[in-house]
């Protein structure tokens, strides 16, 4: 085979592989998608809350906040990008108190030190407008969270998902955080 024919065969093959990898990354689905209703209760143990009376209790915060707009984050661990996301969303919630915007992070882990670590994080970073909770690593089965997703973010209002963002391990970055923050107006409008 001549070099020219080899190039004509290899270049399209490489481009096809690159497209397939990109499509696979974009197709990560985790949890209910935009347009879906929340699938039901979400019982988790509250480690930190803007409502101190909730701390230490096993609650369904999705039921508690009813029809209010909520940013619900499921994560497998507290990473630097996740803490950056929490800080930015904490500021968004503070700006949108009149819309009754709420935010919940549920860490999916059975780490014995997690509850204290979440309390320490909230105190150290001055988190004021958030609920930090945890539950078993598998997460709520009826939410159908992907095992491939390290972070799943649902933005919903009136129990209906308006936006969904899912990230594999190491994929949540500043650009992803900005996309999530840009979707907050979808749920935090006054109507």
Over which residues does each language-model region extend?
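Bacterial N-terminal signal peptides that target proteins for export
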Residues: 1-10
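Bacterial N-terminal signal peptides
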Residues: 9-18
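N-proximal helix/coil linker or "cap" segments that precede and/or mark the start of modular domains
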Residues: 20-48
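A short beta-strand-turn-helix
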Residues: 43-71, 91
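Short active-site neighborhood of thiol/selenol oxidoreductases, capturing the structured segment around
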Residues: 59-84, 101-104
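Typically the conserved alpha-helix immediately C-terminal to a functionally engaged Cys/Sec
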Residues: 77-94, 115-116, 121
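Short, internal strand/loop/helix patches
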Residues: 121-146
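Thiol/disulfide oxidoreductase modules built on the thioredoxin-like
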Residues: 137-177
């Amino acid at each position: 085979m001549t070099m020219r024919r080899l190039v004509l065969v290899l270049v399209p093959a490489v481009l096809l592989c690159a497209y397939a990898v990109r499509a696979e990354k974009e197709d990560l689905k985790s949890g209910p998608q935009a347009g879906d209703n929340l699938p039901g209760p979400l019982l988790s143990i509250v480690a930190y809350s803007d409502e101190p009376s909730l701390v230490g209790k096993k609650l369904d915060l999705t039921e508690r906040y009813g029809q209010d707009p909520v940013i619900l984050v499921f994560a497998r661990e507290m990473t630097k990008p996740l803490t950056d996301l929490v800080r930015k969303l904490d500021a968004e919630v503070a700006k949108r108190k009149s819309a009754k915007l709420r935010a919940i992070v549920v860490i999916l882990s059975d780490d014995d030190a997690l509850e204290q670590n979440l309390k320490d994080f909230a105190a150290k970073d001055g988190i004021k407008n958030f609920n930090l909770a945890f539950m078993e690593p598998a997460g709520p089965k009826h939410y159908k969270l992907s095992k491939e997703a390290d972070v799943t973010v649902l933005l919903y209002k009136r129990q209906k998902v308006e936006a969904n963002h899912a990230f594999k391990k190491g994929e949540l970055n500043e650009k992803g955080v900005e996309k999530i923050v840009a979707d907050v107006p979808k749920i935090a409008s006054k109507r």
